[in-house]
Amino acid sequence: MDKKHKEQELLKAEYFDVLMPYIEDVNVTDIDWNGTDLWITDIKKGRYLSDIKLESSFIVNLYTKLSNIQNQNFNRHEPILETSFCNMRISIWHESLTKMCSLSIRDNPPFIRLASREYILETNYCSSKMLNFLENCVKAHMNIVIGGLPEVGKTELLKYLTQFIPANEKAGVYEDNPEIHYRVINPGKDCVEVCLNSVVDYERIISAGVRHNVQWTILSEAREGTAVEALLNNLSSGVHCITTTHTDDMLTVPDRLFNMIGDTKASSRLINNVYRYLDVGILVTKDETTQKREVSQICLYAREEGKNLHPLIYDYGTEYDEAIPPSIRKQFNRYGIMNPFEEVQQRCI
């Protein structure tokens, strides 16, 4: 453990005290205090009520220290405090807003919870055949969007797939809070990691990426119209991407992205560009009873002979091998992949 890491661990222990058992548990993803009760989200146990009660002095002490670090006011006039600290995303709402202070902590570990190909197959997260396909999609430089509802693990799949990006191809990683940890999970690979702020937003950094020799845009989430439009322009210049979005059906993604942009004057052009420049959509779902996460849909997007296509090659357990459009097959072939359902021999290192 290096000096910086030791200092971070000491600060964690000082700041979070009674919450440390949960913070140190790799299975815990979220810690939520609503002013009365402490709720824990665990990838194995689900969401449950803890018997720990937080004193108001603990919350006050925590937000005072965090607001000082951020040099940010936190009071009835500025009642929302959002920050990143020691690989955690922290949100605190002031008591003037919610009567009692509310705290939310999301753990963003610098490792991949989908630890290995073997783990993915053993847990039935994805079949071997479909996992081969997804890995080959990255190898073939497809543009990929990972969809799902909150807390299903979209970012974890994104992190896993980045392992197949060639080391010598620069990745631009753009996010509000450091969640992807590209440099840590892909040591030795070329990348620039950008945490967005009020000075530089998604639209500006995505547009600037081309002139910065970025070959892969890794976007934590496509959720703003201007950012989506900038991303499509980015892809039209030959940049590749992996991103996430909130959805429960990958067939709806083109319309969802189009609605984000909201430019009715250029409606046909924009929707056509979504199909032209996006290639693959992956839906991740979670069983609320068992907490089991899995890939439930794989959808392809293509514009063929003036028509927009979105065939599913996997839909809740059913495989459709022959549904790959000609333009997608051509993309695979360009990178020497004749059968996209065969295993990638190694990660790109």
Where do the PLM segments sit?
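Walker A (P-loop) phosphate-binding loop of P-loop NTPases
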Residues: 151
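P-loop NTP-binding catalytic core
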Residues: 25, 41, 45-140
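Hydrophobic positions on the alpha1 helix immediately C-terminal to the Walker A/P-loop
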Residues: 157, 161
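Walker A (P-loop) ATP-phosphate-binding motif of ABC ATPase nucleotide-binding domains
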Residues: 143
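Conserved lysine of the Walker
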Residues: 154
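Hydrophobic anchor at the beta1->P-loop junction of P-loop NTPases
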Residues: 146-148
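Switch/coupling sub-region of P-loop NTPases
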Residues: 162-273, 286
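NTP-binding/hydrolysis catalytic cores, primarily Walker-type P-loop NTPases
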Residues: 1-22, 290-349
